């Protein structure tokens, strides 16, 4: 019996909606952040744009390197937390991510807004119930991120449609 069969249809549909939202956040949030900050700054409200620019002022890396550093660090912490054989493993992963994020911001390696983007992406990936789908999303997220960095929204859209064509031919 599926767990969604044991609850009311309204709650089941709400859970499905949350999982679909988590899937899209996992796949597209880092790519959209890079595309908007690199190519489409006019879509950001002026006050928010000033806040993003001022937080990135002291960061020496381009935005793609900054994002890759944080995404790879998050994936390493996630894998490390899974390999610790006890109930304390996930707790160590969360505390490690908090400490690493705080240290990276204080050292001006990454901007605070990027910590928020990577955190939301990581939390959304935990809401995907199937391991193989979650793993696939982790890989495809990097592809969309590179396409967003290279071509903006156009690259993300092209990658999405190519991905749909590949999936429809399976």
Question: Where are the language model's segments positioned?
Answer:
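Generic detector of multi-pass transmembrane helix bundles and their immediately adjacent loops
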Residues: 32, 42-170
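Membrane-interfacial loop-to-transmembrane-helix junctions in polytopic alpha-helical membrane proteins
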Residues: 7, 11-14, 18, 81, ...
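Short, small-residue-biased leader/transition segments that mark boundaries at the very start
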Residues: 2-3
């Amino acid at each position: 019996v599926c767990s969604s069969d044991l609850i009311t249809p309204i709650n089941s549909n709400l859970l499905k909606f949350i999982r679909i939202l988590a899937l899209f956040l996992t796949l597209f949030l880092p790519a959209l952040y890079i595309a908007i900050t690199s190519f489409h700054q006019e879509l950001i409200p002026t006050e928010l744009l000033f806040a993003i620019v001022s937080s990135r002022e002291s960061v020496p890396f381009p935005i793609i390197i900054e994002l890759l550093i944080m995404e790879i660090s998050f994936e390493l912490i996630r894998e490390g937390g899974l390999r610790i054989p006890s109930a304390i493993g996930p707790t160590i992963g969360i505390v490690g991510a908090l400490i690493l994020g705080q240290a990276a911001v204080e050292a001006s390696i990454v901007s605070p807004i990027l910590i928020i983007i990577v955190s939301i992406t990581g939390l959304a990936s935990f809401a995907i119930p199937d391991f193989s789908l979650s793993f696939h999303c982790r890989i495809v997220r990097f592809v969309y991120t590179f396409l967003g960095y290279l071509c903006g929204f156009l690259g993300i859209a092209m990658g999405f449609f190519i991905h749909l064509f590949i999936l429809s031919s399976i």
